[in-house]
A protein has these predicted regions:
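Glycine-rich beta-strand-centered segment in the early N-terminal region that forms part
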Residues: 21-39, 51-94
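Conserved S-adenosyl-L-methionine
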Residues: 164-167
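Short, conserved catalytic or interaction motifs in soluble domains
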Residues: 8, 44, 76, 115, ...
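Cytochrome P450 core scaffold surrounding the K-helix E-X-X-R motif
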Residues: 42-48
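Residues forming the Rossmann-fold NAD(P)(H) cofactor-binding site
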Residues: 159
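N-terminal Rossmann NAD(P)H-binding glycine-rich loop of SDR-like oxidoreductase domains
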Residues: 154, 162
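NAD(P)H dinucleotide-binding glycine-rich loop of Rossmann-like/cofactor-binding domains
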Residues: 56, 80, 90-152
Length: 167
């Protein structure tokens, strides 16, 4: 399969599109055909090597942290998902791998996509949405009913807010 792979840290020249082996699901993994992937500041910080002291991946490494797609396989212990389900997910930091034709992710990091949300819109929700939730709820203590301003409302955070307000 094709994937965007980090060969060495630095600028864009350190990463390239190349053929790699398809991932193999672990018992709790979902195997997904990636239809769209989100691009975030963490992705280029990772490529630049700014996170290597924390994550320490073995290079070469498939980049990408969030995606949307269709389930094409499940591990033996998966209970909540089936082949054909439309899902979006945030890949665990130590695994990454969203910038590929297929990705594996633990079922705890996957959610079913709303039927009226397309893959492109859904791919931008997991990382930005979870980051916003953690910031608002855990760091700032925002409570239900309080108002907040969402700057850049067309991204993952705005999409989540729009979805929550529209039912």
């Amino acid at each position: 399969m094709r994937a965007y792979v980090l060969k060495h840290y630095g600028g864009p020249e350190g990463s390239l599109l190349m053929d790699v082996s398809a991932p193999t699901p672990r018992p709790r993994d979902i195997l997904v055909e990636v239809r769209a992937a989100g691009l975030n500041p963490v992705d280029f910080k990772f490529r630049q090597g700014k996170l290597r002291a924390i994550l320490r991946p073995k290079l070469p490494f498939v980049l990408g942290n969030e995606f949307a797609g269709e389930v094409i396989g499940v591990g033996d212990d998966v209970k909540q998902f089936r082949v054909g389900d439309r899902v979006f997910a945030r890949v665990a930091k130590e695994r990454a791998g969203a910038f590929a034709e297929q990705a594996c992710v633990d079922e705890d990091h996957v959610a079913h996509m709303p039927r009226d949300l397309d893959f492109t819109a859904a791919a931008g929700v997991p990382l930005a949405g979870l980051t916003a939730l953690q910031a608002l709820r855990d760091e700032l203590g925002v409570k239900p009913g309080q108002r907040v301003f969402i700057s850049g409302g067309a991204g993952g955070v705005g999409t989540l807010q729009f979805r929550s307000r529209s039912g």
